[in-house]
Amino acid sequence: TRRIYHRIMEEDGVDRKPGAEELLKYAKEHGYRLALATSSRELHAQLLLKKYGLFDYFDGAVYGNMVSAGKPDPEIYLKACASIQVLPEFAIALEDAPSGIRSAAAAGMRPVMIPDLVEPDEAVLELVWRRFDTLYDVIDLLESDFQNS
């Protein structure tokens, strides 16, 4: 089953979010340290990141198989921040799912939501620092020097 899954992922994959590469490139060019905090298993995530040419943008990564508790537990975000030596209160987390927003907020980060399949409810929206429609909007946030907001 796993072999079939990996073959399908290699052939069809998943859609890359519009603006992903542009955002990662902008952040790297402007000195941001980037960590990946994904619930996906390491092999699967690396396969997709390499396929889309995004893997090398990240300075650190924590995968679902590296934590004992999944999102909304803050463990994955705390480890991701530690992997790039950034305190959570000085980090933003980009999320498309309510459980990820809860995880980032519990870790003490600034959660930024770009909704995908699941629209956030009121309880999740209270945890969100910023909400955007696309990853391109996050570039605008970085350009505006969000540290002063």
Regions found by a protein language model. Name each.
Residues 1-6:
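Short, basic/glycine-rich phosphate-binding loops at helix/coil junctions
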Residues 25, 41-149:
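Asp-based, Mg2+/Mn2+-dependent phosphohydrolase catalytic module
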